[in-house]
Amino acid sequence: MPDITYYPAETRQLGAYVAHPRGQGPWPGVVVVMDALGLSDDIRIQADLLAAAGYLAFAPDLYSGRGIKCVVATLQASRSGAGEAYEDIEAARHWLTERADCTGRIGIIGFCMGGGFALLSAPRYDFAAASVNYGDVPKDAVDRLAGASPIVASYGKRDPELKGRAQRLETALTALNIEHDIKEYPNVGHSFMNRINAGPVLGPLTKFVRMNYDHPSTEDAWRRILDFFDAHIRDADA
């Protein structure tokens, strides 16, 4: 049953959404990193999908207890690789490892801004695998991703903000000999896996970056993610 909980980060308590699989644990865990819209209903849906697949899903609210200025700071951190949000993500991973209903094998998944965090957390923290969904890729990816966990990533070819990122990531991970599965979907744009209720304020932005949920591409992306996580997180427990 999903619930809201609080967990200790470096300097404060943070809220989080937790989705538990059915049946008896322990289960492998996944930290679910939100997009710029925050801990939305959509991010809860992503966590629920992971729980249905047998993963203890933990989605921290990186905006907890901070004002509107934290949104800009958190967005910048997802690209720079520096900032308090990374400490919060590591605290989330640690929270999972301390639970009796978790095997201690933890993955990370992120969407948009969260995809950037997932990518740069892969070489930094002890994650067994990472799923990057339309997250930015730094130009110096070869330097920044050395020692990263295996990575599965999905991008939309029609995303005007992230042109060439799928190929940049593919090139870097190949050079580093890091196991990966990178796919660029030809007919979709940004956030194609997310059901976003944009409203009047964000509506123009969603049109600019072609943010439209696409069911066939989403189904294929989730199939790849779960196959990848099963191989690198779940099967490693056997």
Across the structure, where does each feature detected by a protein language model lie?
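Serine-hydrolase catalytic machinery in alpha/beta-hydrolase-like enzymes
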Residues: 4-101, 195-212
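Short, proline-enriched alpha-helix->beta-strand connector loops that line the catalytic pocket
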Residues: 146-151, 176-179
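Short beta-strand/loop motif that positions the catalytic acidic residue
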Residues: 152-155, 185
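Short alpha-helix in the alpha/beta-hydrolase fold that links the catalytic acid
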Residues: 46, 163-173
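C-terminal catalytic histidine-bearing segment of alpha/beta-hydrolase fold enzymes
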Residues: 179-238
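Acidic catalytic loop of the alpha/beta-hydrolase fold
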Residues: 157-163, 190-191
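Conserved serine/cysteine hydrolase catalytic core
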Residues: 138-148, 159, 223, 227, ...
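Primarily recognizes the serine-hydrolase "nucleophile elbow" in alpha/beta-hydrolase
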Residues: 89-148
